[in-house]
A protein has these predicted regions:
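CE4/NodB-like, metal-dependent polysaccharide N-deacetylase domain
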Residues: 307-341, 433-451
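Extended, Lys/Arg-enriched charged tracts that mediate electrostatic binding to polyanionic substrates
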Residues: 239-261, 265, 355, 367-369, ...
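Structured, charged N-terminal subsegments at the starts of enzyme catalytic cores
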Residues: 255-286, 295-296
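Short, surface-exposed basic-aromatic patches at helix termini and helix-loop junctions that form
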Residues: 273, 331-332, 348-363, 466-479
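Hydrophobic faces of well-ordered beta-strands that scaffold small-molecule active sites
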Residues: 74-76, 124-126, 279-282, 337, ...
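Short, solvent-exposed turn/loop segments enriched in Gly/Ser/Thr/Pro and often Arg
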Residues: 127-132, 283-286, 338-346, 488-491
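Glycan-association/targeting regions that enable binding to alpha-glucans and other polysaccharides
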Residues: 1-72, 607-684
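Active-site and substrate-binding clefts of carbohydrate-active enzymes
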Residues: 71-238, 378-624
């Protein structure tokens, strides 16, 4: 008995041979023989047949075939983004950024997320938005800084009373449990503030130091770290010192921050050139593409919602895509292949535009797939969800990956609550196994898409999520059932890793792609939609102001779109983030500042054109909010105040106005930074 075999490797190389089988035992008229084949590499296509011969004759089996592959490919995308926080009306670059989040997340997330992945045999994708990278450039090249950084740099002895109050009000903006309480001195300062005790000048200087130190990633707080640029970040010495800092210490700590800012793009570029990661992009200022193309295409299905005056500017959407491509090419030395549309928002028109602009793939949410086609796709079935689709296009088709919503949200919202990170990882892997792997049918390749925020989650994890991520990457790289891939790697193939190509023309088409995003607006009909950014009075007022500014720009401007301050201000105002916080479906506890910055960008359009800005831009879109909670009840509000009743659980509110009848209103779930339901509220 012998086995004749042939192996075709992923790179096309062939080898063949015949292996004699050894007799094992007889069982009545049957005999058992054993022939060892292999070893095989991932991606090998193996065919074989068995021949047996005896004095009585010969027997030949049919040819059998199999391919060596994992049970599941996993394409993982970490999305990193911040809106344009720079006030275009600021007279000086120093302090021109109204919020410090670009700088602070760079200390914890933007460099370290890529560096951490590089320590493991995993291939992942990082989405860096152009507007985020633009702001990092501002800090590094144009002398820009934020208000918090200016408060940090100012000697504690020279802080005015107003500056002291600003510092005490904002320098505890960190996760209490994971960023404040674990540091003894920072916790002392926090408790001192909660008691209302006076802060001495040394206390203020310690607070200047600790607010910043708490945002450095865990690895930087525990040891000196050499960066890919050759510089070394060393703030662990300050963590060890705990208190009694000098002003020179504070300035030295600030200098360490700029080392990390300088290393963000070089780290990603080096890892991408080494084939370890893929860097994707987003339309330039993070707009909701389908709404820029035509707001009238959005489904308005929340009770009380309505459409704003029509805003239909596909040319503006195209400009965001063009700028994203050119910005990417400048930074990374190649054209981008992949796109994460802002908020995963897509429509048939938007995807057609993405393909025409030269992108090879994009990703969105499973909820979009569920609403696509004539009757919807069964996105809950892994055989349906775990594959890329090809858009049906008259111009250039594009591959579309649909993320698994529940598995992605588990990492974003749930696993930070686990005290044991390894238990959290095992729970995730068990969910992948039972929800996906065990339910797959056939021998086709399957790819699970995971997409989530790559920065905001980690404040809710112990040690900035580092133990969780290390355990996750170790398990994914060591478990033969799984193989992590970048999106382009899955489509193009990678012979070195045994991954065969999955060309566009071989993908199943997705028919009648639905309009939607990765968010189902609270209070609307079931299913993902665009309602978070349109339909409520505040959102519609913003769209009206945006339309007026664009009309003025079209009338006055003569320069190339995107090449002058007026266009930059308009595109910044078209970003999704302002509309996210308008209305009652999401809340930041700082909506008024987002409102003011949105209007500042629109004023920047008129200022750049030499035009007077409308008086409406000096009036707040968001009414003055007054929030009632059980912890902080409110007994009196002003005539122009807007009352919001907020709780941590669902329910109904019973209320009466004056001597009127008793009425009830349901408490609606509202999201936070990452769209998970954080609390429940009703606005009266």
């Amino acid at each position: 008995v012998s086995v004749t075999w042939e192996v075709v490797a992923a790179d096309g190389a062939r080898r063949e041979g015949a292996t004699p089988a050894a007799w094992h035992h007889n069982d009545t008229v049957n005999s058992s023989w054993t022939a060892p084949l292999g070893p095989f590499a991932e991606g090998d296509e193996v065919t074989y047949s068995v021949q047996g011969a005896s004095p009585d004759g010969e027997v030949h089996t049919p040819t059998f075939a199999f391919r060596v592959k994992p049970a599941l490919y996993i394409a993982w995308l970490w999305h990193q983004h911040q809106p344009l926080y720079r006030d275009p009306g600021a007279a000086d670059a120093a302090g021109s950024y109204r919020a410090p989040w670009v700088r602070l997340h760079a200390l914890r997330d933007y460099y370290s997320m890529a560096a951490l992945a590089a320590q493991h045999d995993v291939h992942v994708t990082f989405n860096l938005t152009p507007v985020l990278l633009r702001q990092i450039d501002d800090y590094l090249l144009h002398g820009a800084s934020d208000v918090a950084l200016e408060l940090t740099r100012r000697p504690a002895e020279s802080l005015s009373r107003t500056q002291i109050e600003d510092l005490l009000s904002t320098f505890f903006d960190a996760d209490w449990h994971h960023q404040i309480f674990q540091h003894a001195r920072y916790r002392q300062l926090f408790e001192q503030r909660m008691r209302g005790d006076k802060f001495s000048r040394p206390d203020l200087r310690d607070l200047q130091m600790w607010f910043n130190l708490a945002w450095f990633g865990h690895e930087f707080r525990t040891a000196a770290v050499r960066l890919t640029t050759g510089e070394t970040v060393d703030v662990a010495r300050f963590v060890g010192q705990q208190r009694g800092f000098t002003h020179a210490d504070v300035l030295a700590m600030v200098d360490e921050q700029y080392k990390l800012l300088r290393a963000v793009v070089p780290m990603h570029r080096a890892l991408q050139e080494a084939g370890r990661i893929e860097v994707s992009t987003t339309p330039a200022f993070h707009p909701i593409l389908p709404l820029l193309i035509d707001t009238d295409r959005a489904a308005i299905d929340r009770p009380g919602a309505s459409r704003p005056p029509r805003y239909a500017h596909p040319e503006g959407a195209a400009t965001h895509l063009d700028l994203a491509r050119s910005d990417y090419a400048t930074r990374f030395g190649r054209q981008p292949r992949g796109l994460w549309p802002a908020e995963g928002a897509v429509s048939a028109d938007a995807v057609e535009m993405v393909g025409a602009d030269g992108f090879a793939w994009l990703a969105t949410d499973a909820g979009v797939l569920a609403r696509s086609g004539r009757w919807g796709y069964r996105a809950s079935e892994p055989d349906v969800l775990c594959q890329p689709y090809r858009t049906v296009s008259e111009r250039q088709a594009v591959a579309v990956f649909f993320r698994d919503t529940d598995l992605s949200d588990g990492v974003g919202f749930r696993y930070g609550q686990y005290t044991d990170p390894e238990a959290a990882v095992q729970d995730f892997l068990h969910a992948v196994e039972t929800k996906v792997v065990d339910r797959l049918n056939g021998d086709d390749d399957h790819v699970l898409t995971i997409v989530l925020d790559g920065e905001n989650a980690w404040g809710g994890y112990p040690d900035d999520g580092r133990p969780f991520l290390h355990s996750l990457y170790h398990c994914l790289s060591s478990d033969p059932r799984f193989r992590t891939v970048t999106f382009s790697e899955y489509l193009l193939g990678n012979p070195a890793r045994g991954i065969r190509p999955h060309p566009l023309d071989g993908l199943a088409p997705v028919h009648a792609l639905a309009t939607g995003s990765w968010i189902d607006e609270p209070g609307s009909d079931a299913g993902v939609d665009l309602g978070t950014w349109i339909g409520e009075p505040e959102e519609n007022a913003a769209w009206t102001l945006l339309g007026a500014a664009r009309s003025t720009l079209a009338r006055v401007a003569t320069t190339v779109p995107g090449a002058d301050p007026a266009h930059v201000s308009l595109m910044a105002a078209e970003g999704s983030d302002w509309f996210w916080w308008f209305g009652s479906d999401q809340e930041s506890r700082n909506d008024a500042s987002f409102d003011e910055l949105f209007r500042a960008h629109l004023r920047g359009v008129y200022h750049a054109l030499g035009e007077d800005s409308p008086a409406e831009l000096d009036e707040a879109i968001v009414p003055h909010p007054v929030v009632w909670t059980f912890a902080h009840p409110v007994s009196r509000i002003g005539r122009r105040d807007q009352l919001t009743v907020r709780t941590n659980c669902p329910g109904r509110l019973t209320f009466r106005v004056g001597d009127g009848p008793e009425r009830t209103a349901g408490l609606t779930a509202v999201g936070g930074v990452m769209a998970g339901a954080r609390r429940f509220q009703v606005t009266l």
